[in-house]
């Protein structure tokens, strides 16, 4: 105080002498007032610290309302303690008014720029103007007092005041009560109350912070206060309430976010007209930082530096119109913080920029030289020459420009400053103009500048991958915006989490782009879609697609093909080699081939137009090859019928000529569908690729043709192949007769059966069918030559056949119709078999009882099959033999199969004898034995059978002697092969049948028995049936007769047994699928005449099948219904429910037969059926099922 007084005295004494005393007194009063104010501020600071300490300790929301009232007024007002102080929200952050004349006085909100200089801050320091009436235009006195008091209390308690208020308090442990329900309810209520109170406390604290920012007296005070909050970690705590649902808290957070971004808004609105000095200082700083070295090729002036940075004009207002000072400030931050990345990107773009300028200068010089040359040429040459020179020079200029454009595409660049300003606007639009809360804004103060650096590096990365020219600037910018927007909505909490999320997005994006490229390459086809239905590789002579109707098939008429057809020598096309060398031709044949090409003007195969090199260049060549192979194989397999072949050669191919009306005149035609249509060039290898046999050659074909035509009287010359036309020529004389054609057919059929395995069976069938067609079309001219190509093109000089889609379509349509008809025929056959099975079931049900009752008195044989009845009575002393091993054949498949038969050894022996008898009947033209199964003519057939026993013919005796000498399985005749194939689908087994002898016949007439091995594969047709009881009786009688005759023929039996043992293995192997009865060798029985009498053809008892086993046994399986006569069509048999019901094998011991032998021998003369004991079953086995 004393120093101040002395200074004032010195001032007074040094002042002007005219200074009056009143002025001195006034100055002294002002000094006194200032002293009083200082005293008052000290007292106010002490009282404010007391209040802040009270708020720090009590943590009540209403106390922040008191602090807000202290901040907005300079005087204290009494507060009623009984009235609660209401919440006072903070004012909305003020906007910035840009006015050039009053920019300093009317700018309202502070600007948050960390890189501004003191000079710029003093010139553009804003003055706060709040919406609240209490806030005046002058600096607030309480802002500094409250700030000092809060800092003092924080130092006193060693913890930040705001962090202490905003943190959630630790909940104190509740007292344990006896009632747990009341305890839980109290805990919930306390938690709810504490949450609500804490939200109010947070809202009050944030409102006080916003009020402090709004009442800052200067920009310096505003920025200082904001940086203190950030440095002390208050923003980290405030960021945790971004997800709060309390409306007051969210409102205050939004206001605090607005305060943080108001500085960014102010910088964006600062133009060169408002603050020219700051703008120029920032530009100079950017140029110095971007080009720190002045040596070498670095620019020296700011104009050159700004041009390299991407500034297009000198008008800074236009350049900075979109971003203002904010764009330059972001670029300075990027250069200062990440100089290495910044310098690398900038140098790369400058290098591309310089190269393009050099190329442009060279182009301008070349154009000048060309123009001078044009002028000289115009003076020296005529007008026509001048025009030609001008055209040539212009074309050279166009080529140079095109080359330069290609180089420009490779050396694409972008404007560095343009990208910086655009990305600044992009981030400003995403975050600043949005009204949502983002945690990244509360993370750090330079969040906006950090996002700018990340986005700039992202743009450069995408540009290096996808940017090829200046036109790609907009797509790359859109992709950058999409990535930033995607990350924005994930709401990352910090810049570090933003970078991690960006890395994940980029990895996903690059992997997807790579996958899409791979899919496009895999799905791409060579030349696009094909115009041909055959799936031929696309492309004509020019490589185009031929989309229009006129150009659709122009690829089949290219110049390359025409030159190939017109040439007389072997021509190696581009990218291919001629493998097949053609033989020399006469001039006549060459002229004829040229006339043919002039008439047709169409190749046989579109494969001629595409070379192997074109297919190899395609990314996926195997798809086209696979498609063509499948279609060609389909068309070749469907053309196997003779009618289709005739239509393809005559009707569908358009061969019309009046000279071919004579069937014996015409040319022999031979066409092979699987051989390539044209040989030479690339098509030599296409035959093996498209399914044709690679080992088949035309030399073999010529040898076959020579052998086929050897039987013709006038032999023609050997066929010759012409590689130019792809045709075979053959001379055939007109004197070929029908005999020669027939011999040729037989010889070629034998050749087709003995062809090499390399030739496909379809090719063999084609050769046989073509021989049938050649017999009807033989030529009358001896010297005429018919060119026969291995394709569908046939041209004899008068007519031509064009290969087109119509003929292919017709042939396929006919083949499909034939296949449909075959399917219908098969369906009819299956349907008829099903109907037969149904009828057999009905017949068995209706005729079962009648046949069982009338079996003893029935004199005629019923051909319908029957199951042995289970209620058949047997003698009391009869004991069936059950020593068979049923476990071997007792599986489920054997029980349920329809192929279970009477001792299959006996049944198959019947088959062989029936085939032999049918053969003998056909040779001697005797038809009386063919109708053995008709019930109306049984007596007549019995008489014929007896006559056949008495009078054997010499031919039959010879056959029997051969069978005795060679008791091996004999081959079937050729006539029975077809029958075997037709009946092979259904396995049939006959029942044992025997003939009824006449009552007046003597015992001496009983025929002898010859036992021979049978053929397992004989046909089973034409076997008669008998009812079950009659078959049992006849089996016993035959068994007795066989045992008597065997005693006199022991030597013959021993020899035959040895042969049977040798053939047992072969018989078992051939009948593995058929169940065979155990321990009974398979024999064939031929009943030979035992005395004199008329000789008959058949030596069977029933004039039918004459084969029975040496030791017959009864059936253990049901009788199948397949064995029916030609006149009757009995249905299929009924399936047995169990194998135990099928046990009908009965063995009669030799002792019992010897006891009854006298009875049987004495009664045969009177009646065969009387003397032979009747075997009857007592009871069938019950099923266990």
Swiss-Prot record:
Where in the numbering of this chain does the ELMO domain appear? 275-488
List compositional bias (Low complexity) regions by residue number: 94-127, 176-194, 361-406, 587-613, 688-699, 733-760, 767-780, 853-864, 912-974, 1053-1072, 1096-1109
**This chain belongs to which protein, by name?**
ELMO domain-containing protein F
Instruction: Point to the regions of Polar residues compositional bias.
Output: 648-665, 721-732, 781-790
Write out the GO MF terms.
Answer: GTPase activator activity
The organism named in the record is Dictyostelium discoideum
Note down the stretches annotated as region Disordered: 88-133, 176-196, 361-409, 566-628, 642-805, 819-868, 883-989, 1044-1114
Q: Which residues form a coiled coil?
A: none
Quote the InterPro entries the UniProt record gives: ELMO_dom, ELMO_domain-containing
Comp. bias regions, Basic residues: 829-841
Q: Where are the transmembrane segments?
A: none
